Each structure stands twice: as C-alpha cells, then as structure tokens.
Amino acid sequence: MYKRQIFSYDYELFFGIMSGTVQKTLIEPTNLLLDCMESVSARGNFFIDYLMFECLEKLSDERAKSDLKLMKEQVKDMVRRGHRIELHLHPHWIDAKYNGDGTWDYTDYTHYSLYSLDEDVRSRMFRDGTIYLTKLAREVDPDYTICAFRAGGWTIQPFCILKDCFKENGIVIDSSVMHGICQDNKYSKFDFRYAPNKEIYRFLDDVCVEDENGEFVEVPITVYNRNILKKTIEKVIRTFSIKKKCIADGTHQRLDLPIEPRRKKWLKSMPTAFSMSSRNPFIAALAFRASNKSLITIIDHPKDFTENALSIIKLYMKKADSITYHDIKQKL
C-alpha cells in the first residue's frame, strides 16, 4: 500500500512543575529536527503555541526579549525551509506567572481548556493568534495563510463553541482527534472513542461525527494498539540499548492530578498515538508497517526530543512521502 505521512509537532514549553527554558526546550531540539528533516527532504507541520508568544511580548525583561526573538526567528526559519506553521492554543497561559529566569509557573490550570473561556476571549485568542502567526510567516512568504488548528490538551470539544472561530479566521482543518482515546479530569475532558476510524473526514458541528457535506476537515492523529506484548518488547529493547535521553530542561510532572497505578497502566491495552521521541525505532517501524492507513499522522513535541526522533524520521521517509495540512487543503 502506498502511504503518505504528516509530521506534526506541538511547539510549546512543558506545563509541569518545571516549564523548561526556551533555549533547551524549543530552540535546540527544533533545530535538530529541522536539520534532520532537511537532510531527507521531509516537510513538517509545527503547531505554534501562540499564547506563549503573547505572554513574552508583554514582558520587558531582557531574558524574555531574547527568548522571544529566538522563537520568532526559528518560526520564520521553519517557513523558510518549506515547513508549515499552524495555530495552537493552550489557554492556561492567561494564568501563568513569569519566574524571571526564563521559566514559568503554571500552578493555576483553571483555564486549561478552551471550553473554560468566555466566547469573546476564545474569539480574541483565535483572531490574534492567526494574525500574529500569519504576519510572522509573511516576512518570509508574502502569500502565507494559516489553515489548520490543534487544540491544547486536545480539548476540541464541544466544537460548536469553536465553529465561528474557525470560520472567521479561515481555518478549515483540525488535527486534535485521536480515535479511541478519552480523558476526563478536573481541568479538561475529551472523548474520541466514537470518532470515525479514518485517515481524514469532513465534519460540521461535531469532530466525532462525519458529515460528507461538512465545511471542516478532521485529520486525526493516527493511533495503534499498544498491548502488553509491545510494551514488553519495548522494555527489553530499552534494557539492552543506549538510553535515549530528553535534552530539554523541563518536565511533564504535575502534582495536581492523580497518577494511574503503574501495574494497571502496564496491563492495559490502549490506543497510542504515532509519535517518535518516546518510541523505539524498531517498535515504530513495526507499527508503521502494520497500519492499514494510507495516511499516517504523527504527533511529536520538540520538548520531548530524543535521538529516536531523528532515527524514526529517516526510517519513515524511506517508507512514505511527507505532506502538509496545506497540501490537503489545496485538494479540497
């Protein structure tokens, strides 16, 4: 089967007890990814966490100014190298506090989800984010337009409250859904268990309900079933191979959410997103080969970068061509 793939990355800091710094969490790992993709003619799609830029724009601190400049130049470099930048929103930035040393305090997650915001606040975020990223991209490509969105924390539901935000800003593609996955905690919830198990589909008012005449398109993150056998193989491989360490200086760890017992998590067979940094290349290759999808949409984060990501990019590019969300939009 002829396959294509989408390399998608959420460009953001950590949202745990240590946010990490811009240099170690974004700039350095992203540059490694960009160089690797260029070496194999791969094209990436970077979902840019706009509110991070907005918060830095408000600070007069020299470190913050320097970090902002680095990020803006890197985003323009993405476009210059032929990659795409698209809109990503993590609304809990409105409650974040700057620590003065390049890191952030996220102890308040009240507004973690888009549905926690008033309508006018959501509309403003979409509008300002689209304008900001478009302006950055057009310093490189005068005709650039944003066409896709990914919700922070995948909280794209209920879509009916976001529909006008999409329409008003020319966004036609969403890529937040992961078939079979759900979450419900005090800050966020989503339920994709009954979403169409398809590579791409149209929808209108609900991202989990296909509508052939819908004006929006869902490009779901591809998942595969990660059972106890695959987990065991991964563990054995990790035991006898050089450990691939994350180079970033932040952490996902949070103290405000319960941690699922390790044994229960280990025994559970679960749908798992196609990713790269946290996967072993051997397991990634098996999952890619076993997938019955002709389009594989991969999600990763520069902040999670390990050398595994570089190996898997090179491996996957031997098996399939890479495309962008804009390529999909042009064929609608």
Regions found by a protein language model. Give the residues of each.
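Active-site beta->alpha N-cap acidic-glycine motif
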Residues: Y2-R84, C147-R150, I298, K303-T306, ...
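Active-site and substrate-binding clefts of carbohydrate-active enzymes
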Residues: E212-Y224, P261-R263, L286-L332
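Structural alpha-beta junctions
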Residues: L34-S41, E168-D174, L315-Q330
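Soluble or luminal CAZymes and related metallo-dependent hydrolases
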Residues: T25-P29, S66-L70, L117-G129, P158, ...
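Generic structural signal for well-ordered alpha-helices
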Residues: T30-L34, M71-V75, F126-T134, K163, ...
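Active-site-adjacent pocket scaffolds in enzyme catalytic domains
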Residues: A148-R289
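Distinct, well-ordered alpha-helical segments
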Residues: M18, Y98-N99, C160-D164
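Metal-dependent polysaccharide deacetylase catalytic core of the NodB/CE4 family, i.e.
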Residues: Y50-T155, V177, G214-E218, V223-I228, ...
